[in-house]
Amino acid sequence: MSDLFAKLMDQIEMPLDMRRSSAFSSADIIEVKVHSVSRLWEFHFAFAAVLPIATYRELHDRLIRTFEAADIKVTFDIQAAQVDYSDDLLQAYYQEAFEHAPCNSASFKSSFSKLKVTYEDDKLIIAAPGFVNNDHFRNNHLPNLVKQLEAFGFGTLTIDMVSDQEMTEHLTKDFVSSRQALVKKAVQDNLEAQKSLEAMMPPVEEATPAPKFDYKERAAKRQAGFEKATITPMIEIETEENRIVFEGMVFDVERKTTRTGRHIINFKMTDYTSSFALQKWAKDDEELRKFDMIAKGAWLRVQGNIETNPFTKSLTMNVQQVKEIVHHDRKDLMPEGQKRVELHAHTNMSTMDALPTVESLIDTAAKWGHKAVAITDHANVQSFPHGYHRARKAGIKAIFGLEANIVEDKVPISYDPVDMDLHEATYVVFDVETTGLSAMNNDLIQIAASKMFKGNIVEQFDEFIDPGHPLSAFTTELTGITDKHLQGAKPLVTVLKAFQDFCKDSILVAHNASFDVGFMNANYERHDLPKITQPVIDTLEFARNLYPEYKRHGLGPLTKRFQVSLDHHHMANYDAEATGRLLFIFLRDAREKHGIKNLLQLNTDLVAEDSYKKARIKHATIYVQNQVGLKNMFKLVSLSNIKYFEGVPRIPRTVLDAHREGLLLGTACSDGEVFDAVLTKGIDAAVDLAKYYDFIEIMPPAIYQPLVVRELIKDQAGIEQVIRDLIEVGKRAKKPVLATGNVHYLEPEEEIYREIIVRSLGQGAMINRTIGRGEGAQPAPLPKAHFRTTNEMLDEFAFLGKDLAYQVVVQNTQDFADRIEEVEVVKGDLYTPYIDKAEETVAELTYQKAFEIYGNPLPDIIDLRIEKELTSILGNGFAVIYLASQMLVNRSNERGYLVGSRGSVGSSFVATMIGITEVNPMPPHYVCPSCQHSEFITDGSVGSGYDLPNKPCPKCGTPYQKDGQDIPFETFLGFDGDKVPDIDLNFSGDDQPSAHLDVRDIFGDEYAFRAGTVGTVAEKTAYGFVKGYERDYGKFYRDAEVDRLAAGAAGVKRTTGQHPGGIVVIPNYMDVYDFTPVQYPADDVTASWQTTHFNFHDIDENVLKLDILGHDDPTMIRKLQDLSGIDPITIPADDPGVMALFSGTEILGVTPEQIGTPTGMLGIPEFGTNFVRGMVNETHPTTFAELLQLSGLSHGTDVWLGNAQDLIKEGIATLKTVIGCRDDIMVYLMHAGLEPKMAFTIMERVRKGLWLKISEEERNGYIDAMRENNVPDWYIESCGKIKYMFPKAHAAAYVLMALRVAYFKVHHPIMYYCAYFSIRAKAFELKTMSGGLDAVKARMEDITIKRKNNEATNVENDLFTTLEIVNEMLERGFKFGKLDLYKSDAIEFQIKGDTLIPPFIALEGLGENVAKQIVKARQEGEFLSKMELRKRGGASSTLVEKMDEMSILGNMPEDNQLSLFDDFF
């Protein structure tokens, strides 16, 4: 037995006779899992065989008793090397299973524990009476029974239940007789009880009052019992039980109120053994407040009954008592100044590999008193900005690094080449077979070689070598070599010497030569023999460079491709001979295709420039030492993603060398080249490599444990020796050795989250490469990679001795941290690009347009507004942002498109004047287009200038123009006008690509980048990962545990992307690496735009970001303009016909019953959805200002529902007076008499949903001010309900576009429908659409029924929206034509009188490319046959058949041959 197991046996005082038995001879402790929260220890033991039942029970009882004394619960399981399936042993353990939770539930135990079991045909057979419910057993008990027997050491058993007729009859008879006896006894007992009762009954006396029940005393006793109750691990609960007590953390809470006013708190808790759903009821608000401690993240003790929830069908605790408890987090117990620094930690930005946010990583290090912590994500630095800000806040140094993928620029084909004629050389083509991949820990078992000259084998070498131990099954299975092959083999040193003699005066050749040569050299060195010095050719690299078009260059695929015999792959003699045959094929092709004749030419003339793409990746950790290093880091990340990306970002060594200033390098993990050299080539080779680095990394033995499973290291002692060797490498290379943790999650309990994430990648991922073959193949276990405290780290390295452990864990890591300077990752200021004379141009354009509209001199209200805005815009350096936006809008206008504004840019009058937005934020006003006379309404009585009555100019009689939406400038750039402007613009989707290219044209390609985004695993996706993990690895989780695991696995980086319209502009006096690295979106190296590596939000305060979004409204307006010739700018905003749409359908010439809605809102942007149509029906807007209100109400959160809607229904307020848009609050409060600053602050608090989150004192101050100025209470209460509000400028821009579209619906309907179907409709069904009103209404009814039953597909939902418009169009007297092979357009509907002709793209399954190809082909000539339509038009047989069914093809024959014969008949 192992020393550790023996120590445990001493502690539990296991009897000596049992300890000396054969069962304990090779006993070992594989692992101990400690759950600190629930004080549960899980032991995992290894034994040679399943223990005798008496021995097992003794071990179990002594473990339980010993640890109970320390208030620790214990569970254990056994892995048995050999399993005895004898009936007696199985029966004993089967019955033992019912003594352990969860199999010990009363119902399960009573029904199944006494059944007999046997082992037949590799199955455990349970003989059961026929009345036992087999399905219930399989669904509720079988998984637990399998799990328990597996824990006893029997492995995963297949269990079948068979019906035993004899047992059924026997038990039935017993049941009947016992039931009769029970009935008889019950009758007799009842009679005797009655007699006794009468005898004991006292004489009748006056009734005395019963003693008063002491509720307080009972409650105190119940509370005392709750405090002392035994805590049950959640994993043990499998059935309904009463008075169970849990302790754990709340991870999800939902509070609901029933119609009767009762409250229910549904919450979920975990103790990290499992998770549970819980419920707590409260009768009123007062009782509800008693349970405020039930909050996310709280640690609670709860008691209640476990019952099956009738709705969820899962076990749920109905909570009776609850108490908040203190949770003792792990702490770093080392004294101040003696704490380690973690230098290798991954965050959730390590793609699909790590869990912690950078904030949580830094917070944990700071909480433990560490002075610094490093961030080293895989190949990216996307956590840097958040890490930078969090570290500054936490007062801790952040060390910025990454774990890079280093490759050699050019991987040589030949090592140590000399001037030699390849045709005249003699070659020794050799292969070795080994017991593993480590030259230091595994053994040579075969060396075979073929000596070849001019393609002929002239001599062969083949020797087996006895490693001195039996071969593993895996080695035998892989190589075909058995222990019999090795019997009588020569000693290793003899074979090595003989092979050296065999190789003299030859070029050595091997496939993947670095492995074979490394193994040979390590063995030569170990036996004091000279290493290989002659030239070596690697046929793997030879093939990669000679045949780059091949996907696979392994020996097997190559031999198949070139028809070279390979009968027994992975036996050295066969592999060597096959490699030799391939070599001479390669030499021939190299000579004929590339003129290569000399050995030196292989590397100089054949190795490709991009051979780094196939080079083996080695990990290295790179750290930023200073500001120069930060920029170099950004350059390296950019180059690895842009220029050297191949599967993963790669950094060629020469590129790293060129940018190494300000950077420090570590040797990384077991995938680093120094660790690999120690393992495969020896210390000397590792020392040579280590000189390249600044320090050597060593990691806790637990991190290297998977290497044991992969047979790269033999055992724990082997791991410790490798670590000692790495320390020796550091000593000889004069490099410090630092202990790092390779952190991938923070707490030990979080290991399962990473397991789920990593396993979701499938077996194609390297980390999931399997061990073994066939059905038994499993991925190697993941290492224990939590964030370790200094104490835990010192314990991991205790085998080094106290002083050395302290040096590598504490002293050296602190010294390294001291070498790192503070750097500025994120700039503190805004850096806008430079445009010559931007300030003068913005001012000039503004006044020029203002003078044109309002005259010179300007009205005071206009002059003051412009002066106020320009002071802010020019004074804060924002002029270039305004000018850039103006240039983009102007270019799009010149191409014939309107550009709609988004957000609050319409709050800026300067933006209006220079043409960025159509929205005029001034108070409602009249202005004369002839003499520029103006009138402003500033008392708040009018909500929008468009609602002013028409009237002529009093000076010249010209009809006034009306404008002004009364929006304060403060809502755009803040009260002080210094907020960075965020100008969002809606370009036509058709023109958006051109607008993007305009940015490049204006600022330059090297300064314009798409705004990058980072996509993470969503909880729904994580849920799928958990269910997949359950399926693939035989796990069984209750619903609450699935939810917990999904939440834990969510948030991990999965991919990158780009903002749909965001473009970041770098100032032209700096370069992009001053702000961020760059990359391609989603690693798509064919993309036309590069993106910022950082999420654009991380740098949006530092650089200009232009939102150039694509939108349908400008496209629709352009289409309508093309069809009608009407300039959309001339369409009035107060057209009576358009406004009539909001109150009825008469203007359309139809009834509400005909089109299924009481207003004409169908298909109108902003107002056509069911939700907004309902709002219109309730409010009946009649003015532009009220439409703005509706727009704000529909886009806000908690602004309409439960707020304004109720106020209007109850007659407290009207649509005009409720709070609709955010800006209205400031304007209304200023009109009420509040100071502008306070009005602005109240608006900001309300619009962000902060009204109830600010301090009561602050809120009461605002309320008092509002009441002093007669603001009604309903208005104040409404403010408190709002979570988010829509900007009025945004609403104005959208409503203006909507009214223009509506204008065409009223006055030019066929054009409107043509534009709608061409641009907005998402789904078509031509057979229905052209089938007339009855067909359309029937299909709509069909979808309506499906919707009620939740059966409608997304396509059907989209189709319903289309059919609503089709129905309206048909009811208005217009028609839908059929698809016409020679008249239909590819993608747009065509107008023919009162009929619309659909395009080809409207046919289901016919894409844009095929549609365009059909149109192009018909221009070249008529389609004479269906075959020709398929061939020239590119239509599939299915599409042609569909066209034929719809009578689109007429009498078109199948092929041209038939059409020729038609002429004769």
Curated annotation (Swiss-Prot):
Where is the protein localized? Cytoplasm
Q: Name one GO molecular function term.
A: 3'-5' exonuclease activity
User: Which UniProt keywords are present, listed alphabetically?
Assistant: Cytoplasm, DNA replication, DNA-directed DNA polymerase, Exonuclease, Hydrolase, Nuclease, Nucleotidyltransferase, Transferase
Query: Using the chain's own numbering, where are the disulfide bonds?
Result: none
Report the EC number(s), separated by commas if there are several. 2.7.7.7
Is Ligase found in the keyword set? no
Q: Tell me the Gene Ontology biological-process terms attached to this UniProt entry.
A: DNA-templated DNA replication
Is Cell membrane set as a keyword in this record?
no
SMART domains recorded: EXOIII (SM00479), POLIIIAc (SM00481)
Where does the record place the Exonuclease domain? 427-583
Q: Which reaction does it catalyse?
A: DNA(n) + a 2'-deoxyribonucleoside 5'-triphosphate = DNA(n+1) + diphosphate
Q: Which terms in the GO cellular component ontology are assigned?
A: cytoplasm
Subcellular location, principal = cytoplasm
Q: Which family would the database say this protein is a member of?
A: Belongs to the DNA polymerase type-C family. PolC subfamily.
Q: Which NCBIfam families does the record associate with it?
A: dnaq (TIGR00573), polC_Gram_pos (TIGR01405), PRK00448.1 (NF001688)
**Primary role:** Required for replicative DNA synthesis. This DNA polymerase also exhibits 3' to 5' exonuclease activity.
Q: Per its record, how is this protein called by name?
A: DNA polymerase III PolC-type
This chain's source organism reads Streptococcus pyogenes serotype M12 (strain MGAS2096)
Which gene holds the coding sequence for this protein?
polC
